[in-house]
Structure formats: structure tokens, C-alpha cells
Amino acid sequence: MNLIFTRIIRRFGEGKRKTPFPGDPILVPDEPYDSKIQESQLSPMPQIDAKLINHLERLSLVRFDSEQAVANLRSSIRVAKRLELVDVEGVEPMHTVWEDQECPTFEDVEEDPLPIEEVFRNASLRFDDFFVTPPGNLPLESKERFDLNVINEWDTIGKPVAPEVKLTRMTERKK
């Protein structure tokens, strides 16, 4: 393991920062930026309930398995709400994060379609002329796993971490 790590350091350099093009200035700060936006200017935080958590789990395929995970979601929403205050009047949308870098697009070229049997050759399951995919993120528990009142008050309390996790079958197995 140390040999691999040593080779990686020799190849890429220890502590060297990478940029897309040599000579580009590094625009990412070393320390996090402390926002000057007043919390009173932000729109109110949405109340997170069990229905919303289940909906987000289904959409994102991410399992909120602890109160800390839901508290992190609230923290992310709070950061995203700051973007509502950004004035973007007259600013053209960017296609890439690098202003001076081209984002080439190609013309659509019509090609001969593949035969259906060749398309489905690698499909493990097939129904008529459709691929059968595995089901998405299905909720495992229908009961509420979290104390939602505490979570919805968590960021107003000002604590750096969420309250203690309630014991469930999932957390008991992890211990």
C-alpha cells in the first residue's frame, strides 16, 4: 500500500494543486468564506416532514438514515437559500465553469438504427421491446424514524451537530 501511495506522490507531486491549464490562477480559497448575508434576509426554511423525506429519498436515491443526515439537508437548504438573493440581472448563463474555455457542440448526424435484437443483446431482462430495470429506492420503513420537531429547530438552536440519533433496527445492527 505504501508503495502505491509513494508512486502516486512521485507522479502527481505532494501537495501540488491542480488546475485545468498550467499557469491558471487558483480561484478556490484555502479557508472557507464566511458569508456576510443576514439570516433575516433569507426566506423562511421549509418544514421537513416524513412525507418530504420519503419523497426526497425516492428522487435522489439517498437514504436519510439518521437525524444528522436530515440536519445536514437543512443546512444545505439554508446555504442554497442564499442564492435567492444573488442579483443575476443581465448576466448570461455559462455553459462551463471556465469563462475562457470553449464548450464545443456537435451537429446531430443521423445514423442507421441498430436492429432491435442487437440493441437488446446485452439486456438481462426484457419485456416486449423494453428494457426491464430494477426498482428504485423503495422506502424500507413506513414509520417516522426521526424526531422531526427537533430537526426543524436544529439550525435555530445553533448547535454544530444534530441531536442524538434515535435507536432503530438499522442503528442497533451497526453497533
Curated annotation (Swiss-Prot):
Q: What is this protein called?
A: Glutamyl-tRNA(Gln) amidotransferase subunit C, mitochondrial
Oligomeric state and interaction partners are given as: Subunit of the heterotrimeric GatCAB amidotransferase (AdT) complex, composed of A, B and C subunits.
Miscellaneous field = This protein may be expected to contain an N-terminal transit peptide but none has been predicted.
Q: Which PANTHER family match?
A: GLUTAMYL-TRNA(GLN) AMIDOTRANSFERASE SUBUNIT C, MITOCHONDRIAL
Domain of life assignment: Eukaryota
Q: Protein biosynthesis: present as a keyword of the record?
A: yes
* Native source species: Caenorhabditis elegans
Q: What does this protein do?
A: Allows the formation of correctly charged Gln-tRNA(Gln) through the transamidation of misacylated Glu-tRNA(Gln) in the mitochondria. The reaction takes place in the presence of glutamine and ATP through an activated gamma-phospho-Glu-tRNA(Gln).
Record-stated family: Belongs to the GatC family.
What does the entry list under GO cellular component? glutamyl-tRNA(Gln) amidotransferase complex; mitochondrion
The UniProt entry's GO biological process terms, in alphabetical order, are: glutaminyl-tRNAGln biosynthesis via transamidation; mitochondrial translation; regulation of translational fidelity
